[in-house]
Amino acid sequence: KNLPYKGKGMKKVRKIIKRVAAAALAAAVAAGLTGCGSVTSGKRIIRVSHAQSETHPEHIGLLAFKEYVEERLGDRYEVQIFPNEILGSAQKAIELTQTGAIDFVVAGTANLETFAGVYEIFSMPYLFDSEDVYKSVMQDTDYMEKVYESTDEAGFRVVTWYNAGVRNFYAKTPIHTPDDLKGKKIRVQQSPASVAMVNAFGAAAAPMGFGEVYTAIQQGVIDGAENNELALTNNKHGEVAKYYAYNKHQMVPDMLVANLKFLNGLSPEEYQIFKDAAALSTEVELKEWDKSIEAAKDIAQNKMGVEFIDVDVDAFKQKVLPLHETMLNDNPKIVDLYNHIQEINEKAKGGKQDGDNA
């Protein structure tokens, strides 16, 4: 990690190392693990892939997952975690999880839309009235289990969720009103609903993988992106985009996805341990998330020179609310979950809400 030289040459070296490592690991995984797990010293290797850095709350949550499993099943299983898209982009890693080459992958709901239409609902702008409602829905395990089973036909199942925060716009130039988005090329997740949302704001949606965003902003291919505050620091987007606007268009989870054949092959005792490990990883991630967001805001503002802008959220909301009806008409699979969320929104009205404290 600590190579004795810096600058542009160093960046090129890092890129080359990452490319070579990714190619080697992906090739090894694809060649040696197609449809089955690797066994070393009598232990089954469990491979877990995610797109974030090693300081990200999701990685810390997964370390708790690893520790919990190995403490109880260490004679049978070894959990290996691959951060930073080492095994490929989320979409590629999902495909490898389908085949069993990877056992678990952390994926955004936008990546899951192609496999189960119900996940499109999380791309709907202003779906949750507050962060309290969002967390209440996600922590209703009994209800969410039905949603998680929707990808069984594709060969994988969600086992838990992680908080991926409140998504906001950030760019090279200030964003105070929806008009400031007009004509701007904004990176979005590779989801039709996210593309429609950004276009409805008046911007030009540019769907691309998360790993490409820094260079795309730096080189002027795009003007900005939309994500939570950790993107500014963990992924260094604050080096190239200095304005972050709190328009709060989405509150989204990431999902820990497991190969279904692997889950079905576990004994009841093992299955319960993996399930408990997944629940623990969420508990750890949620605590780390809140701490990390505060730290990220401090670093972005005071060390990277990012300006945080409070905006009239309602002005942004009015631009995209018609998408609710459009999406409900176009995709019947989201209707039940949408109605369930609206019921919880209604119950929360008049009570304490913290959605404005992103």
Residue ranges of predicted features:
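N-terminal secretory/targeting leader peptides
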Residues: 36-132, 151-153, 157-358
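Short, solvent-exposed secondary-structure boundary motifs
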Residues: 29, 146-151
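A gly/proline- and charged-residue-enriched helix-loop-helix capping module
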Residues: 132-148
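Short, low-complexity disordered leader/linker segments with a strong preference
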Residues: 1-45, 71, 350-358
